[in-house]
Amino acid sequence: MYKIVPDTNFLIYVFKHKINFDYEIERALNTKFEIVILSPIKEELERLLKSRDLKGKEKLAVNLALAKIKNYKLVDYTANYADEAILNYAKENENVIVATNDKELKEKLMENNIPVMVVRQKKYFEIFGMV
């Protein structure tokens, strides 16, 4: 079974653009999976919600993401930054696919032969790397 680990921006993007998260993962992967939310991602979403910088669709997307991640497996993970947590978790565990559109994080993941799931054309997911 694959573990799908989304980063914060991926979650916000998905809910901002009303993409059916679970369906798109199933369509792109076509096998069993579980969605894993690392604690730094949840904490980052909570921090964003409290900040005054978010308005409109972004604030709604963060609210939706926080509500939706309650349905997924939450893993306590200690790291200084969310991206660091994602990269280390992916290195330490098998069958991990990281969902991100962050260019820098994608490059680090690909350097470590970790598959990456991205959003294409604001509506569907595509996986790069060895699966």
From Swiss-Prot:
Q: Which residues form a coiled coil?
A: none
Enzyme class, broadest EC rank: hydrolase
What is the official name of this protein in its record?
Answer: Ribonuclease VapC4
Gene3D superfamilies per UniProt: 5'-nuclease
| Organism for this UniProt entry | Methanocaldococcus jannaschii (strain ATCC 43067 / DSM 2661 / JAL-1 / JCM 10045 / NBRC 100440)
HAMAP family referenced in this protein's UniProt entry, alphabetically: VapC_Nob1
Q: Does the keyword Iron-sulfur apply?
A: no
Question: Disulphide bridges in this chain?
Answer: none
Checking Pfam families in the record gives: PIN_9 (PF18477)
Q: Which UniProt keywords apply?
A: Hydrolase, Magnesium, Metal-binding, Nuclease, Toxin-antitoxin system
Q: Which cofactor does it need?
A: Mg(2+)
